[in-house]
Amino acid sequence: MSMQPTDHIRLTAFVHGHVQGVGFRWWTRSQALELGLAGSATNLDDGRVCVVAEGPEDRCRELLTRLGEQPSRHRRVGTVSTVIEQWSEPRGVEGFTER
């Protein structure tokens, strides 16, 4: 595990809506990589997608905005009804994976 700059943070976002089977995890990965974030996007059994992103706080907040903005200015796929966010200390993940 690498040391993270002090401005790095971990975002965990639970995305509700029609977000499975539509390319949402792929879209999320592309947005996160564009912002220089590491983490993952995972389908959950209840139909939500769990997005974990680590990096500078301002970039994590930008990803959060992109996940929930209506209408999407970033060609987001699917339909998002709600995004529930949690913030914590980063764990030093690398890369961004779809699970």
Swiss-Prot record:
UniProt-listed Enzyme Commission number(s): 3.6.1.7
InterPro entries recorded: Acylphosphatase, Acylphosphatase-like_dom, Acylphosphatase-like_dom_sf, Acylphosphatase_CS
Keyword DNA-binding in record: no
Catalysed reactions, semicolon-separated: an acyl phosphate + H2O = a carboxylate + phosphate + H(+)
Keyword field: Hydrolase
NCBIfam families: PRK14422.1
Protein name in the entry: Acylphosphatase
Organism: Corynebacterium efficiens (strain DSM 44549 / YS-314 / AJ 12310 / JCM 11189 / NBRC 100395)
Gene assigned in the entry: acyP
